[in-house]
């Protein structure tokens, strides 16, 4: 899977890299043959559940793991056999590994000092790095005198002061509380944009990936299921796994009734109507799976007019979420469809459990899934 034109040199290029671990019980494939390109200056995220191969991929880029097959290129230079300290990349971990006995300034200056840069150059670089991460004025503090977010920024400054071609981040926000984590997401994106450095960010948190990334590779079982922008990944998931892992998604499966141009009409009861724009051809009588996001569905006491998709259902659960109310509705094509209704004070319909209700949405808000087996959605993707 490549995503760059021939005249471009990607910041990081992975060419058919794989990683196989051997043991007495047999081989374990952590990463299957993987080819992708990260553009220079891009904020690129590897997103997926535990055990999907994202951290192994990052460690192969860093040089901490040797790929079983394939090549790794950094700005056109093959670094597959180059040791980590000579790859011109730096890595930031969830455990920031700051030196507790050194001040902020001394922690950040550690790398340039090891490179034996001139004293004035060290002073200039450290000053620029501290200004970039908004730590000017805290140079003399030690790590135990800093908050978790400040410690994280010290780790970033220490990595960026060496001016790497790429910065690799392995779930660096995982140890922070929710509010601080959300604030640091915006900070990380600002720092990346101002530094102009390629970021490769590993996370299992879909919110982090959607908030910060220019592009996301969604990984599952050692493979990339989908590569795209946050909007593409969320609005047009390619597989049931991606649909289930990114946000909350409803998967609808039903036999094909007929095709009208590029639109499939699914087999439902006479009063119901489900239309799905086709991405790939479907043979007559085949089952089609499609996804529609909960916020795209509307509720009504009566079937809507026109060509809107519509299903009759029974409300099973009503959950107040603050900004929205979640309705779980049983229908003929899905045991449960989730609907989000915004609590903006304009709703004239407030269904209760047991009520019969119509659900409707625009056909263009449904998206055909390539793999029809909806059971591919993992349990850990549940909201």
Curated annotation (Swiss-Prot):
This protein's record includes keyword Transport: yes
SMART domains recorded: AAA
UniProt keyword terms in alphabetical order: ATP-binding, Cell membrane, Membrane, Nucleotide-binding, Translocase, Transport
Subunit: The complex is composed of two ATP-binding proteins (PotA), two transmembrane proteins (PotB and PotC) and a solute-binding protein (PotD).
ABC transporter domain location: 12-246
Reaction(s) catalysed (UniProt annotation): ATP + H2O + polyamine-[polyamine-binding protein]Side 1 = ADP + phosphate + polyamineSide 2 + [polyamine-binding protein]Side 1
CDD domains: ABC_PotA_N
Keyword field contains Aminoacyl-tRNA synthetase: no
Protein's recorded name: Spermidine/putrescine import ATP-binding protein PotA
Entry membrane topology: Peripheral membrane protein
Gene it is expressed from: potA
Functional description taken from the UniProt entry: Part of the ABC transporter complex PotABCD involved in spermidine/putrescine import. Responsible for energy coupling to the transport system.
EC assignment: 7.6.2.11
Protein family (similarity comment): Belongs to the ABC transporter superfamily. Spermidine/putrescine importer (TC 3.A.1.11.1) family.
Location of this chain's protein in the cell: Cell membrane
Principal location listed in the UniProt entry: membrane
Entry GO CC: ATP-binding cassette (ABC) transporter complex
Binding site for ATP: 48-55
GO molecular function, one term: ATP binding
EC class of the enzyme, as a word: translocase
Top-level taxonomic group: Bacteria
Pfam families assigned: ABC_tran (PF00005), TOBE_2 (PF08402)
InterPro entries for this protein: AAA+_ATPase (IPR003593), ABC_SmlMolc_Importer (IPR050093), ABC_transporter-like_ATP-bd (IPR003439), ABC_transporter-like_CS (IPR017871), Mo/tungstate-bd_C_term_dom (IPR008995), P-loop_NTPase (IPR027417), PotA-like (IPR005893), PotA_ATP-bd (IPR017879)
